[in-house]
Amino acid sequence: MLKKIKISLILALGLTSLQAFGQENPDVKIEKLKDNLYVYTTYNTFNGTKYAANAVYLVTDKGVVVIDCPWGEDKFKSFTDEIYKKHGKKVIMNIATHSHDDRAGGLEYFGKIGAKTYSTKMTDSILAKENKPRAQYTFDNNKSFKVGKSEFQVYYPGKGHTADNVVVWFPKEKVLVGGCIIKSADSKDLGYIGEAYVNDWTQSVHNIQQKFSGAQYVVAGHDDWKDQRSIQHTLDLINEYQQKQKASN
């Protein structure tokens, strides 16, 4: 009986801790993926429907590298506060994987808190045309980064969700951050394609498959990222869309 009471107390305390975390950060969910790499998920509404946006951050011996940003500027400060609370380190670098607000919307904020901000030259050009905040530093489509003892690579596979979408590869962890060019395995369609290049998308995904065939985890840009069938599902969705387009012509 005493043993059962102890177990009940432990479970109750665990649930209380989880609830407290949720109350402090109702719009930001952080999950450890592998080693010092974490997936963070934020939520926003598009056309009346609530969606999750996924990205990652890497804890290095020099500080924290954030890929993309929380979806919505109202979440920026609580996100960086939570990072400091969890790891005792500040964000020192931010990289946007394309020009949309759920990826590049935090460039100004991260710059203001002292982080170095980066994007490709293609993304920078789009942001400039749209009169939006831009990164402090730009690079050509492919670039390798080394921060302290940690390394990762930015790779441009070709056009897809947008003209400028890139992916990020963490070789030690064997994790690929697909961003919005990779659809979640539970996606019903290609989502927003107002700036997409659907006819190029398939080849771009094949380029990703070939270059990062050793990936153990692929983090899709939206919704469920844990189902690792996301790359194949993306190809299926593209094909489905193209077949419907042919049938309607």
Swiss-Prot record:
GO terms for biological process: antibiotic catabolic process; response to antibiotic. The keyword Zinc applies. Its EC number is 3.5.2.6. Residues 1-22 form the signal peptide. It is found in: Periplasm. Zn(2+) 2 binds at residues 102, 180, 222. SMART domains: Lactamase_B. One of its GO terms (cellular component) is periplasmic space. It comes from the Bacteria. It holds the Pfam family Lactamase_B. Coiled coil: none annotated. Inhibited by chelating agents such as EDTA, 1-10 phenanthroline and pyridine-2,6-dicarboxylic acid. The keyword Hydrolase applies. Keywords: Antibiotic resistance, Hydrolase, Metal-binding, Periplasm, Signal, Zinc. Its cofactor is Zn(2+). InterPro entries: Beta-lactamase_class-B_CS, Metallo-B-lactamas, NDM-1-like, RibonucZ/Hydroxyglut_hydro. Binds 2 Zn(2+) ions per subunit. Zn(2+) 1 binds at residues 98, 100, 161. It catalyses: a beta-lactam + H2O = a substituted beta-amino acid. GO terms for molecular function: beta-lactamase activity; zinc ion binding. Substrate binds at residue 183. Monomer. Belongs to the metallo-beta-lactamase superfamily. Class-B beta-lactamase family. Confers resistance to the different beta-lactams antibiotics (penicillin, cephalosporin and carbapenem) via the hydrolysis of the beta-lactam ring. This is Metallo-beta-lactamase type 2. It comes from Elizabethkingia meningoseptica. The gene is blaB1.
